[in-house]
Amino acid sequence: MLNRELVKGSTVILVLTLLNERPMYGYELVKEMGSRSGNELQMKEGTLYPSLHKLERQGYISSYWEKQEKGPDRKYYRITDEGKEVLAERTKEWSVFSAMMDRILKWSGQNG
């Protein structure tokens, strides 16, 4: 199981990345993250929904309700233009951070 703080710190980039592909509802986001991570990432809905609400308040995503033939209506989330800009920035930051961590960990492993 992944460290909860690592997951929490990655929520924004994960959500924006998935919503950049297509609108999704909350449970769909949880399942998609789990599926793509080989079920290593088990984000709880109680973690996801506060993040979705915060992203919506910040203007990075928007939401809309869609009627379902069967079952209750679903609230879908989609990325906004501002969210796409934030995603581009965060993706660059992640690449730099990830490469830096790889260098440090590799160096430490060779010299430890």
Curated annotation (Swiss-Prot):
Molecular function (Gene Ontology), one example: DNA binding
Domain of life: Bacteria
Keywords, ordered alphabetically: DNA-binding
Tagged with keyword DNA-binding: yes
Pfam families the UniProt entry points to: PadR
InterPro entries: ArsR-like_HTH, Tscrpt_reg_PadR_N, WH-like_DNA-bd_sf, WH_DNA-bd_sf
PANTHER family per record: TRANSCRIPTIONAL REGULATOR YQJI
Protein name: Putative DNA-binding protein YwzG
Organism annotation: Bacillus subtilis (strain 168)
UniProt lineage: Bacteria, Bacillati, Bacillota, Bacilli, Bacillales
Gene behind this protein: ywzG
